[in-house]
A protein has these predicted regions:
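Short aromatic-acidic-glycine turn motif
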Residues: 80, 86-98
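N-terminal edge beta-strand
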Residues: 31-69, 74, 105
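Extracellular/periplasmic metallocenter environments
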Residues: 21-37, 105-149
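Solvent-exposed beta-strand/loop surfaces of large extracellular or lumenal domains
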Residues: 94-109
Length: 149
């Protein structure tokens, strides 16, 4: 009888933490969870133009936050933007080009042969220091430093 009582008490004690879960915390997310509008930020655009800086300042991002930014090319020159390490540290939700939505599995670079705008929506994931740059360029203004914290 004592053994049975001890066994039942032990099973009940092991089951208690399951019922102690704290579900009343408010993380600020809506129905879409981490993709909710309350977790979304817009970044300043990147400008692709011959001899012009890519951006005004480096980006500092928070891991777990959803971001959107535009790449605006003026068509002054055929220009690309590379950042393979950065693109592997984020999850790209969508790329929008003239109303067409693309949902890629990954990305290494983008290139503009003429004037246009591209919007990229992504979730910052892996903390670290990254960059996007115009390939073959050496100037500091042709490179955007990105930190994910």
């Amino acid at each position: 009888m004592t053994r049975t009582f001890i066994a039942i008490a032990a099973m009940l004690a092991l089951a208690l933490p399951v019922h102690a879960q704290d579900d009343d915390d408010n993380d600020g997310f809506g129905m879409a969870g981490i993709l909710s509008a309350s977790n979304k930020e817009d970044l300043p655009p990147i400008t692709l133009s011959a001899g012009m800086p890519l951006a005004d300042a480096p980006w500092t991002l928070d891991s777990g936050t959803y971001y959107e930014f535009e790449i605006e090319a003026d068509g002054s020159q055929e220009l690309a933007l590379v950042g393979p390490e950065f693109f592997r540290a984020i999850w790209i939700d969508e790329i929008v080009i003239e109303g067409l939505e693309i949902r890629p599995l990954g990305l290494d670079s983008v290139e503009f042969d003429e004037a246009g705008t591209m919007e990229i929506g992504f979730l910052a994931i892996k903390p670290g220091s990254y960059y996007m740059m115009i390939p073959g360029s050496t100037g500091e203004t042709q490179r955007l430093e990105i930190t994910i914290e």
